[in-house]
Amino acid sequence: MLTNQEAKYLLDLEKVLINPNQTVDLSKKKNRLELISHQDSDYEFWVEITTNQKIILKTSIHNLESNSYVGLLRIDYRGGHHNPANILPTLPNFLKPYADKWFKPTESHMHLYVEGYKPLAWAIPLTDINFPVKEITQPADLSGLIFNFAREINLKSLINIQQAIL
């Protein structure tokens, strides 16, 4: 698997859409954007946007050499979660206070890759980090969420979003 430093390196790489004309259609329950980094072409990335009762944005990496997939970052709205209780030496200090924490479905949170654990096993409340979209209260909030998530994963392409018609 990856080290914490490798995961950070991958998140920090500048990424662009493989298909720059792709549109996120919010009337669909799931959208997938395929990304690539011209800084390191050994990897492909994708972003999955799930909008149903639970709203989830996830970015994963595809290592072309080993043909393996690893989740790097995910944001959950309206989904519960339980962080591991065990603290390994690879756990960053900022996550230690959240060991064994149960997230209620009403507590939005960001999952992070941590070396030595299953991918995305650790999460931190959005209220405790500098991510601007803390809650989703109306469909119009989704566009801002997608743009801020793109910024978080260093996606440089413009994203075309088609709003759902209610």
Give a label for each model feature.
Residues 6, 40-42, 74, 100, ...:
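Generic intrinsically disordered, low-complexity segments enriched for polar/acidic and small residues
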Residues 8, 15, 28-30, 54, ...:
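Context-gated lysine
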Residues 4, 19-21, 31, 52, ...:
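Detector for Asparagine
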Residues 1-56:
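Charge-rich, low-complexity N-terminal segments
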Residues 132-166:
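Acidic, proline/glycine-rich low-complexity IDRs
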Residues 44-49, 69-80, 122-141, 145-146:
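Short amphipathic beta-strand/extended segments with alternating polar/hydrophobic composition
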